[in-house]
C-alpha cells in the first residue's frame, strides 16, 4: 500500500535538505516571504529564527493586538533584525473599512444551527445570545432599509459561519444561525455583494497608521480597497504625516476592487491578492482566474504582488504541508508572484519556523524547475513604458547579455531602488544584487522579486562604483570568485547621468 503521508513527509524533508545545500552553493530564492507576527512568534528569539529560515518581511496586523503589546513586539523584531544583519522590512496591515464581531466573555462561543444570535451596537462581552459590532452604525443602516435587510446573509470568519437577518431593532440585528460553528473574538463579517458606505480611512486607522510609521514600518497594506480613490485618500493621509517614502500595498479582496483593479494597480506601489475575504465576497470558483490576472497585470507594470491567505493553513496545527498546499504555493510562483505570505501559520500556529522553511523550499524548487515563458512574453507585450528610456534599454540589454554569457548575477548600483526594480521587471534568470547607500532603500527592496539589497558607500566614479559593487556582491555569498557577472552603474561626476554603464566582469 502506498502511504501518501510517509511519501509527502519524505518529499518535504528531502526538498528542505536540498534547498539548504543549494543555499550554501550560492543559489538565491527570488520569491520573497512575508510572515505575520503574532503570539506564536513575537519573541526576539523566534523572530530571529524566522529571519534565518527565510523571512523577508514582517507583517504587523493592526486588526489584532494593542499598542503596548505591539511596541514590545516591534522592539523585539528590530533587535532580531539587527542581530541577524539582514534586511527585513516591516509591513503595517490596516483594518480598513471592515466589520468584525467584538469579544466574548470566554474568548469564543459555539453557535448552533437554527439558534437566534444578535449583533449589537454595544455589548460589553459577547455570549451565546449575541456580540457587539466593530461598526455599530451597521445596525442603523440595516434598520433604515426596513424589509430589504430581512433575509440578507452575513458570513462570519471567512464564511465558516452563516447568519441570516431575521429582524432589526434600534439596538441590534437579530439573526438566525444558518450554518453554525465556533465563533472567536474579533472575527470578520462579510456581506457578499453589499457595499457598506464607510469612510475609507477611519479614525482608528489614522491612529494605527501613525503608530506603525512612527515605529519603523516602511510599507502599509491597505485593506478592503474598493477603488483607486481609496488609495489616493490613504496616500494623502500618509504624506500629511511626513512619510512620503512609505509605500502602499492595495489589498484587492472584494468585487469592487476587482472591477477597478487596473486603476488601483496604477495608484498603488504594490498589490496583495487577499484570497480570504475575496473567497467570501466573490464566488470561490473565480479565485484562480482572478489571482492569475492580478499577478500578470502587476508584474507587467513593474510593481510587486503578494499572494496571501491559507498558503500553508494546515501547518497551523501540523508540521508538514498538504500536497494541495505545496501545489498552491508552487503555482503562485509559476504565476509570477513577487512574494507569498503566512498568516495564522506564523502568527498563531504551532510550527512557525517550519512554515517559513517549507515556503522557502517550495518556492526555490518552483523557481528552478518552473516554466516562465508565457509570463515573460506577457511582460514583453504588455509591459510598462518606463519614463526613462535609457534605464529601461540598459536593463533589458543587461538581462539578455546575462543570459547569453551565463552570468551568475546582475549587480546594480541603486541609490533609490528604481534601477533594481526596473531590472527585475524583465525577470532575469539570475538574481539581482542591488548596492544601495541607505538602509531605507534596502528595506524597500525586500518585497521585490529577485533582488538582494546590500549596503554600500557613496562613490563618485564608475570605476569606484563598479569595484565596490563587485566586492559587496562577493560578500553576499550569492556569487564567488571566478563567476561572470553583469554590472550596471553610473558616473556621479556627470550631473545629468543616470544608469549609463553596463559591464561584463569576472569576479
Model-derived regions: residue spans:
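Non-catalytic helical/linker scaffolds that mediate oligomerization, partner binding
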Residues: 19-507
Amino acid at each position: 500500500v502506498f502511504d501518501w503521508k510517509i511519501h509527502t513527509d519524505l518529499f518535504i524533508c528531502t526538498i528542505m535538505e536540498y534547498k539548504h545545500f543549494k543555499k550554501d552553493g550560492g543559489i538565491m530564492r527570488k520569491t520573497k516571504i512575508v510572515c505575520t507576527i503574532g503570539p506564536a512568534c513575537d519573541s526576539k528569539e523566534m523572530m530571529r529564527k524566522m529571519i534565518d529560515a527565510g523571512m523577508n518581511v514582517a507583517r504587523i496586523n493592526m486588526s489584532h493586538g494593542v499598542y503596548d503589546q505591539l511596541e514590545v513586539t516591534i522592539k523585539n523584531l528590530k533587535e532580531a533584525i539587527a542581530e541577524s544583519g539582514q534586511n527585513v522590512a516591516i509591513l503595517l496591515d490596516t483594518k480598513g473599512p471592515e466589520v468584525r464581531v467584538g469579544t466574548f466573555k470566554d474568548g469564543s462561543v459555539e453557535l448552533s444551527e437554527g439558534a437566534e444570535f444578535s449583533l449589537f451596537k454595544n455589548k460589553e462581552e459577547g455570549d451565546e445570545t449575541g456580540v457587539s459590532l466593530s461598526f455599530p452604525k451597521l445596525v442603523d443602516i440595516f434598520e433604515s432599509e426596513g424589509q430589504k435587510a430581512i433575509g440578507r446573509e452575513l458570513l462570519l470568519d471567512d464564511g465558516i459561519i452563516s447568519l441570516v437577518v431575521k429582524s432589526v431593532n434600534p439596538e441590534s440585528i437579530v439573526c438566525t444561525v444558518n450554518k453554525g460553528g465556533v465563533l472567536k473574538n474579533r472575527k470578520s463579517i462579510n456581506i457578499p455583494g453589499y457595499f457598506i458606505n464607510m469612510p475609507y480611512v477611519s479614525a482608528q486607522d489614522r491612529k494605527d497608521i501613525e503608530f506603525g510609521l512612527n515605529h519603523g514600518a516602511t510599507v502599509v497594506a491597505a485593506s478592503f480597497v474598493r477603488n483607486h480613490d481609496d488609495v489616493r485618500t490613504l496616500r494623502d493621509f500618509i504624506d500629511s504625516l511626513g512619510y512620503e517614502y512609505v509605500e502602499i500595498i492595495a489589498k484587492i479582496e472584494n468585487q469592487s476592487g476587482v472591477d477597478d483593479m487596473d486603476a488601483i494597480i496604477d495608484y498603488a506601489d504594490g498589490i496583495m491578492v487577499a484570497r480570504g475575504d475575496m473567497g467570501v465576497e466573490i464566488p470561490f470558483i473565480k479565485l484562480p482566474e482572478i489571482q492569475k490576472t492580478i499577478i500578470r497585470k502587476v508584474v507587467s507594470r513593474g510593481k510587486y504582488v503578494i499572494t496571501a491567505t491559507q498558503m500553508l493553513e494546515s501547518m497551523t496545527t501540523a508540521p508538514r504541508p498538504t500536497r494541495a498546499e505545496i501545489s498552491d504555493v508552487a503555482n503562485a510562483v509559476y504565476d509570477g508572484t513577487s512574494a507569498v505570505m503566512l498568516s495564522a501559520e506564523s502568527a498563531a500556529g504551532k510550527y512557525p519556523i517550519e512554515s517559513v522553511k517549507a515556503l522557502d523550499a517550495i518556492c526555490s524548487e518552483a523557481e528552478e524547475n518552473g516554466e516562465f515563458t508565457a509570463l515573460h512574453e506577457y511582460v514583453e507585450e504588455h509591459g510598462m513604458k518606463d519614463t526613462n528610456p535609457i534605464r529601461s534599454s540598459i536593463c533589458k540589454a543587461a538581462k539578455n547579455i546575462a543570459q547569453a554569457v551565463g552570468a551568475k548575477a546582475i549587480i546594480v548600483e541603486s541609490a533609490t531602488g528604481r534601477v533594481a526594480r526596473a531590472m527585475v521587471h524583465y525577470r532575469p534568470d539570475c538574481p539581482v544584487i542591488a548596492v544601495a547607500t541607505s538602509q531605507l532603500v534596502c528595506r524597500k527592496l525586500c518585497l521585490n522579486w529577485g533582488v538582494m539589497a546590500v549596503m554600500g558607500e557613496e562613490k563618485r566614479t564608475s570605476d569606484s562604483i563598479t569595484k565596490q559593487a563587485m566586492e559587496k556582491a562577493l560578500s553576499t555569498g550569492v556569487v564567488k570568485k571566478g563567476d561572470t557577472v553583469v554590472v550596471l552603474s553610473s558616473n556621479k561626476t556627470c550631473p545629468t547621468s543616470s544608469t549609463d554603464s553596463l559591464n561584463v566582469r569576472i569576479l
